């Protein structure tokens, strides 16, 4: 069958859809937000494909997998195994990196283990093997009369009880052994837990190093090397100090530094294994340590609470000691830390060994001044109590590279593992694409490296091909966006080489500049050409125009959507007269509302920005305007706005002056603002109790209205009676959740509808109180649009609902679980909440890609809302790739010219027309696409 045939799809708002989709083609689902695109693509097609696959497994295998319910559809024919690539599955694991997600790091580990050249991390000399005579010579030349124990490593960090090994050692004549670091006699009973890791070392000899014992030592060494296949340990005993362990090997050693090294294996380069992980940070690359900026305010007088850890409740002892320190060292405590000289600053922080005299509770005391940092540690013995004063910092031992020094010193083609992980993927691709880099390998090494290099090159190319050349393989997976994560997984799928699969993708163009969109489309085409069917939920013009087949769901959102308003080729679509086609063929255009910008111009100037790829940048941002920050992916937009301006401005606005600086970044013009609000795409709540009604505050007004009803007053019900978060009106069986969680132990928890309230969340008595014939549960089940009509005569409620309508969210229900909302919907709910507040006209709003998940019609709505906030005198700063927003902005700041090391600069700024006209001169990609759009 060359088609997927859907009959009677009724999931969520779908209205008994019948649809035929051609197989092995590039299919785009489009339509307004909330029209039912994702329901059809993910909740129907993907869910049924996944369910059928799971049904084919044995009942034993199924019990370990999440159960997928059958979607509400009569029949789907021609369905193939389905893979969903959405944006919600970004990793939260601090050990995940771009390299580990794509498995490129696994191949790099293999390459380094098989053909890597080892160098000593101390002297940087090449490492070579030690012979038996070298080992004997080194040990015999230890300090005269040193007491040593010569050990043969038998078992190293392995699970098991090892009774046979211990018995074998005893029969060979060994009397003692070290078991997990403790010396035991082998003729005694030894019980080892078989599920725990153990280390066993046979004691070959205990001897004093001197000339008389030279032959005895040599004999013991030969015996140990034979017993443990070329390895031995020597424990040097010391009278008044812990013993020292030295490892010797016939395999790898640095003779200059007298150090031996283990044979390389892939685990030697794994930061998730003790064999390769940095011992200081345990492979995380970062450590939590005291942050001086958090325990000390350098601009506050010392006697007015500058040192936060010693001032406050129950800390008078340290405050008195500090006064004594200042008096002894001649420091004026009315000064700020910044006003002290270097010697005084160091003494205050780290101590100077002097004894301080001071009074505490009328008693004279004398104590050494250890410095503020040591005092902080002494005050808070448990590190968790210090969490407020700590920051995550790069590990000083491995410099953030996560591996041991011995692993980081290994080289392939003159580069270390850290070099491959910190270079942009584009550079890594070009490096592996040049075979001359590996011409130094001998024939045997070339044969070993060839298949590994092929796998690395393929995978790196796919990442580069989907527009992610600016990322690094060592980039923490937690810091990549949803769009980047999705494109990484697309690249991985191409590398997998699967055919005959139905791929369902959710807006893969998110976060992608127009320059890279065609690259992405080409990559998707490659996936389709392998014999796969692609269903892409998308709003991007270019992606829609390059599709083989388009399905438009509508005509509106929510209850007014759920129908197929068009299905066919792009050519047929452009001749249609419904909403999507009208925007594509130019009949309808997104235009800004007309209002005059303020004549008096103010700017926010950010100076001395040094972060990621931005070096010593200063930039002016006009206020009381809609300003778009543009640029290709990785050019530095988020670094400038989200990582620099946002936290700095939020901190400084608490005590704003005309010019202020924080961490070297200076901001001029803050006096024109009273607050900075970042409207991100994080969920509005993490539990089923959070919903749009509670978040926007409209729920409070609705509860008050229900409490004012005559029946409610007679029964003495207050507004709290209509809350599902407190006892009184809620259903106590489910505690107002509407569902009951059943723990399934080794299976995922299951949510079942409460059989007492049937999902209504309230008890029957509360549900008897009605407004215009509707209970509180009925109201929560209404869409925003329905509720707006229902509460039209109640201004306090209607005005809040109107803001949700204004941002294009009329289709969501008031009581919709916050965890089911998309990032774009969550962001617009936050925007609606801001719209409903009393405005000061001095707010700076920062938004990151607010058009995510928005149809052209929704973008039009959003643009009106953004400009309405600017019309009130506020400033709007938007990071955006969508040309419909960019061309209607008041001002553009374009970063680039490219991503990664080739970015970090402001290459163009001005009105959209100015940026477009100067695009050839500035080499602005945004300007070039803008020029085409403004024609």
Curated annotation (Swiss-Prot):
The upper taxonomy is:
Bacteria, Pseudomonadati, Campylobacterota, Epsilonproteobacteria, Campylobacterales
The keyword tRNA-binding is annotated on this UniProt entry = no
Q: How does it assemble?
A: Forms a heterotetramer with UvrB during the search for lesions.
Q: Which species?
A: Helicobacter pylori (strain ATCC 700392 / 26695)
Q: Gene for this protein?
A: uvrA
| Stretches annotated zinc finger (C4-type) | 254-281, 731-757
The record places domain ABC transporter at 310-579, 599-931
Q: What is this protein called?
A: UvrABC system protein A
**Signal sequence: where?**
none
Annotated disulfide bonds: none
A GO-annotated cellular component: excinuclease repair complex
Give the matching CDD domains: ABC_UvrA_I, ABC_UvrA_II
């Amino acid at each position: 069958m060359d088609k997927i045939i859907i009959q009677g799809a009724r999931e969520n708002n779908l209205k008994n859809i019948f649809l035929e989709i051609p197989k092995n083609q590039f299919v785009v689902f489009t339509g307004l937000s909330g029209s039912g695109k994702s329901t059809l693509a993910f909740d129907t097609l993907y869910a049924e494909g996944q369910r059928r696959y799971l049904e084919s497994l044995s009942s034993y295998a199924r019990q370990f997998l999440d159960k997928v319910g059958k979607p509400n559809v009569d029949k789907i024919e021609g369905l193939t195994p389905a893979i969903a690539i959405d944006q919600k599955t970004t990793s939260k694991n601090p050990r995940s990196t771009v390299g580990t997600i794509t498995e490129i790091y696994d191949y790099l580990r293999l390459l380094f283990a098989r053909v890597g050249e080892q160098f000593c991390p101390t002297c940087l000399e090449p490492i070579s093997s030690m012979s038996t005579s070298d080992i004997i010579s080194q040990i015999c030349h230890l300090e005269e009369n040193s007491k040593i124990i010569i050990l043969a490593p038998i078992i190293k960090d392995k699970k098991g009880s090892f009774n046979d090994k211990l018995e074998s050692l005893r029969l060979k004549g060994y009397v003692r052994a070290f078991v997990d670091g403790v010396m035991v006699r082998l003729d005694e009973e030894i019980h080892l837990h078989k599920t725990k890791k153990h280390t066993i070392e046979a004691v070959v000899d205990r001897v004093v190093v001197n000339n008389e014992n030279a032959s005895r030592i040599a004999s013991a060494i030969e015996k140990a090397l034979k017993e443990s296949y070329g390895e031995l340990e020597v424990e040097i005993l010391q009278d008044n100090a812990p013993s020292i362990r030295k490892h010797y090997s016939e395999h790898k050693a640095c003779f200059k530094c007298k150090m031996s090294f283990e044979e390389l294996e892939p685990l030697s380069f794994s930061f998730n294994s003790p064999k390769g992980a940095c011992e200081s940070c345990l492979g995380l690359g970062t450590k939590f340590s005291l942050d001086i900026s958090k325990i000390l305010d350098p601009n506050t007088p010392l006697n007015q609470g500058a040192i936060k850890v010693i001032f406050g409740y129950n800390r008078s002892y340290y405050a008195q000691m500090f006064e004594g320190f200042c008096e002894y060292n001649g420091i004026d405590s009315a000064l700020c830390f910044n006003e002290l000289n270097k010697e005084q600053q160091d003494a205050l922080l780290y101590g100077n060994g002097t004894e301080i005299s001071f009074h505490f509770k009328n008693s004279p005391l004398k104590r050494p001044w250890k410095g503020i940092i040591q005092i902080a540690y002494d005050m808070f013995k448990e590190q968790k109590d210090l969490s407020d004063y700590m920051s995550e910092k790069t590990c000083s031992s491995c410099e953030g590279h996560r591996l041991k020094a011995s692993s980081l010193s290994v080289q392939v083609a003159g580069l270390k593992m850290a070099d491959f992980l910190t270079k942009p993927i584009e550079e890594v691709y070009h490096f592996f694409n040049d075979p001359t880099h590996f011409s130094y390998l001998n024939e045997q090494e070339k044969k070993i490296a060839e298949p590994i290099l092929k796998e690395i090159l393929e995978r790196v190319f796919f990442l580069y091909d989907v527009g992610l050349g600016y990322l690094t393989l060592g980039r923490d997976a937690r810091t990549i966006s949803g769009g980047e994560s999705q494109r990484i997984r697309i690249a991985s799928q191409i590398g997998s080489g699967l055919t005959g699969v139905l791929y369902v993708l959710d807006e893969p163009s998110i976060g992608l500049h127009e320059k890279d969109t065609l690259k992405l489309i080409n990559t998707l085409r490659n996936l389709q050409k392998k014999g796969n069917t692609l269903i892409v939920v998308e709003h991007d013009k270019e992606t829609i125009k390059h599709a083989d087949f388009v399905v438009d769901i509508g005509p509106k959102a929510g209850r007014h959507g759920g129908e197929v308003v068009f299905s066919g080729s792009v050519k047929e679509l452009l001749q249609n007269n419904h909403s999507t086609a009208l925007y594509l063929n130019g009949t309808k255009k997104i235009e800004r509302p007309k209002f005059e910008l303020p004549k008096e111009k103010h700017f926010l100037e950010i100076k001395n920005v040094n972060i990621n790829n931005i070096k010593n940048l200063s930039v002016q941002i006009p206020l009381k305007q809609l300003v778009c920050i543009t640029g290709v992916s990785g050019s530095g937009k988020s670094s400038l706005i989200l990582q620099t301006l946002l936290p700095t401005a939020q901190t400084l606005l608490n005590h704003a002056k005309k010019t202020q600086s924080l961490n070297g970044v200076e901001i001029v013009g803050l006096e024109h603002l009273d607050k900075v609000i970042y409207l991100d795409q994080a969920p509005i709540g993490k539990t089923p109790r959070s919903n749009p009604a509670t978040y926007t505050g409209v729920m409070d007004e609705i509860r008050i209205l229900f409490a004012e009803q005559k029946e409610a007053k007679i029964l003495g019900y207050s507004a709290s009676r209509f809350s599902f978060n407190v006892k009184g009106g809620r259903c106590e069986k489910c505690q107002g959740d509407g569902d009951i969680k059943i723990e399934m132990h080794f299976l995922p928890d299951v949510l079942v509808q409460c059989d007492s309230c049937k999902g209504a969340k309230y008890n029957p008595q509360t549900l008897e109180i009605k407004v215009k014939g509707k209970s509180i549960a009925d109201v929560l089940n209404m869409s925003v649009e329905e509720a707006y009509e229902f509460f039209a005569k109640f201004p306090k409620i209607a005005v809040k609902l109107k803001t949700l309508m204004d941002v294009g969210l009329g289709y969501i229900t008031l009581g919709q679980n916050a965890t089911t909302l998309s990032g774009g919907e969550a962001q617009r709910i936050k925007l609606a909440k801001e719209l409903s507040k009393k405005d000061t006209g001095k707010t700076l709003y920062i938004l990151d890609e607010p058009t995510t998940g928005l149809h052209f019609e929704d973008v039009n709505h959003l643009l009106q809302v953004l400009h309405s906030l600017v019309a009130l005198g506020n400033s709007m700063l938007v990071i955006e790739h969508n040309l419909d927003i960019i061309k209607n902005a008041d001002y553009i700041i374009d970063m680039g010219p490219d991503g990664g090391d080739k970015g970090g600069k402001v290459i163009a700024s001005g009105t959209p027309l100015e940026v477009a006209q100067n695009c050839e001169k500035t080499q602005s990609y945004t300007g070039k696409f803008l020029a085409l759009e403004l024609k």
